[in-house]
Amino acid sequence: VRIVSYNLRKHAASGELTGIAEAYDVDVLCLQECDSEALPERLHHLVLADSTRANRLGLAVYVRDDRYEILHSQVFAVQKSLHDRVLAPANERLLAVHLRDRDNGEDILVGSFHAAPLTALNSLRRKQIASAHDGMRSLSPDTPAVMVGDFNYPWFIRGLERHLTTSGYALKRTTEPTYLRYKFFSGYFDFVTSTGFEIQSVDVLPAGASDHRAIRLDAELAA
């Protein structure tokens, strides 16, 4: 499954989505910081599977529906940061979809995730990530799962990797930094966690109107 994830910077990069879907032959497109009410039902060959409604910074997932049947989708709230309490509503931080491959009948889970901002502690983000993984498992236990998005976790990534390994998830970072807002500050904010998949690399797409660069990956079911 080919997945692209993109933080739109408060919907600023929304005009790029149709071009991305077509140019990169995307199967699943995961969005963060989108305006759910302004999203089209289709982007080229992709259909809108679901989006958040109550969140100030929306999440959405588009799916190639001629290849994948959309079985179910669900929005999950995770632990709130101080930022979430002050600038509510912002606690819907995972949108997960349960898909079935129309060709081989295999089920997969894909999640679009947006962690608390850098004003929160890494320990809170680790709890949010663990809670998001639990939410995905609740949709379909033992189903291969991949979660992509803006993790807001540019430092001390080895500690996060150790935590994920104990829970059965692997972390894959991008080949280049994904956050480019300031010339003197960039980082690997957007990456991938997965279980039951093999992911060789996570590539970064050219910069657009967002302060994040979109990421692209091909996830193969583990043997």
What are these model-predicted stretches?
Residues 3-12, 80-89, 119-121:
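Acidic/histidine-rich helix-loop elements
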Residues 3-8, 17-42, 62, 97, ...:
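Active-site beta-strand/loop signature of hydrolases that rely on acidic residues for catalysis
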Residues 10-17, 124-126:
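Structural motif
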Residues 11-15, 56, 91, 186:
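Structural motif corresponding to alpha-helix initiation and N-cap regions
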Residues 28-107, 205-206:
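Structured beta-strand-rich core segments of catalytic domains in phosphoester-bond hydrolases
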Residues 73, 137-144, 151-223:
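Metal-dependent phosphoester-hydrolase catalytic domains
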Residues 103, 108-118:
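Active-site-proximal loop/helix segment associated with metal-binding centers of metalloenzymes
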Residues 114-132, 155-164:
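Active-site-proximal segments of metal-dependent phosphoesterases and phosphodiesterases across multiple
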